[in-house]
C-alpha cells in the first residue's frame, strides 16, 4: 500500500514506516567525509574513519585555506589519508570560505558521487577541529560515529521500515528563536550533521535540493529532503552536547 506525504511543492510516495526484521543487506553504502585539516584533525579523522565495517567506499573532501594550498599541503594530506584509510577511493578539494562553513565542501562531495552505484550515502565531517580543547565535542563525535558508522545496521533497519533519513539529535525547529531563522526555514535538523540518506528513495531530492549558502546551510539541506515523519532519530541526548561530557555508557546498545 502506497503512503503519500506532501510538504511544500514536493511529495513522497512510498511505504509507511513499519516494524520489520529484514535488512536491506544488498545496498551499497558510501561514506562522505568533509575534512578541514586543522589542529587535532588527525585525531578526529581517526575517530571517524578507523573502523568502517559496513560502508563500501569513502570519498573525502579536503577544505584548504589559500595559504595551505599555496604551500601544496594537500599533497601531504592526500598521501597520509590514503596510507592510513584503505577504503578511501577518491579525494577532492575545495577552498575554505568561513562564511559558508561546510557548504562548499559538501557540494564538492555531492558532485563526486556515482549515483548509479550507491544506494545509501552517509555524510560526516571533522566536527570539533576548530575547538580542539573541547572534549565534550569529541564525545559527541564518538557518539555520532557509533550510530552512523559502527552501527550502520541500525540505519539499514530504519530504511527497511520506510524511513529515508537516519541520524542522531533530531529536533524540530522553533521559528520564534532568532538564531534558527538563519537556517532558511527547514522543518527539522540533525544537530552535529552526521546523516545517512536512502538514495534509492530520494536520489532526485538529494541531487537537486539547493544547499543554502550560509554557515548552517548543510544542516538546513537535510531538513529539506523529506518530511520529518520519515526521518529517523537513532539517539538523542537529554542535554546540549557542547556543554557536558557524554561517555559511551550513555548510548551503547547491547544486542
Q: Could you describe each region identified by the protein language model?
A:
Residues 1-255:
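ER/Golgi luminal nucleotide-sugar-dependent glycosyltransferases, focusing on the catalytic module
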Amino acid at each position: 500500500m502506497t503512503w503519500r506525504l506532501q510538504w511544500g511543492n514536493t511529495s513522497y510516495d512510498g511505504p509507511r514506516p513499519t516494524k520489520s526484521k529484514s535488512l536491506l543487506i544488498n545496498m551499497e553504502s558510501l561514506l562522505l567525509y568533509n575534512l578541514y585539516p586543522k589542529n587535532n584533525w588527525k585525531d578526529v579523522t581517526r575517530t571517524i574513519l578507523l573502523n568502517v565495517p559496513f560502508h563500501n567506499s569513502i570519498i573525502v573532501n579536503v577544505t584548504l585555506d589559500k595559504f595551505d594550498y599555496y604551500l601544496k599541503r594537500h599533497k601531504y594530506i592526500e598521501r597520509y589519508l590514503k596510507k592510513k584509510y584503505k577504503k578511501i577511493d577518491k579525494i577532492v578539494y575545495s577552498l575554505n570560505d568561513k562564511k559558508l562553513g561546510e557548504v562548499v565542501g559538501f557540494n564538492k562531495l555531492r558532485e563526486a558521487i556515482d549515483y548509479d552505484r550507491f544506494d545509501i550515502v552517509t555524510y560526516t565531517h571533522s566536527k570539533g577541529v576548530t575547538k580542539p580543547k573541547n572534549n565534550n565535542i569529541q564525545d559527541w563525535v564518538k557518539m555520532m560515529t557509533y550510530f552512523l558508522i559502527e552501527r550502520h545496521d541500525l540505519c539499514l533497519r530504519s530504511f527497511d521500515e520506510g524511513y529515508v533519513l537516519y541520524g542522531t539529535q533530531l529536533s524540530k525547529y522553533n521559528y520564534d528563536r532568532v538564531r534558527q531563522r538563519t537556517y532558511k526555514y527547514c522543518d527539522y535538523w540533525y544537530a552535529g550533521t552526521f546523516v545517512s540518506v536512502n538514495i534509492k528513495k530520494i536520489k532526485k531530492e538529494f541531487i537537486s535540493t539547493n544547499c543554502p549558502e550560509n554557515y548552517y546551510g548543510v544542516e538546513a539541506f537535510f531538513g529539506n529532503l523529506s518530511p520529518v515523519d520519515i526521518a529517523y532519530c537513532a539517539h538523542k541526548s537529554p542535554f546540549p552536547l557542547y556543554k557536558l561530557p557524554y561517555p559511551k555508557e550513555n548510548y551503547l546498545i547491547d544486542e
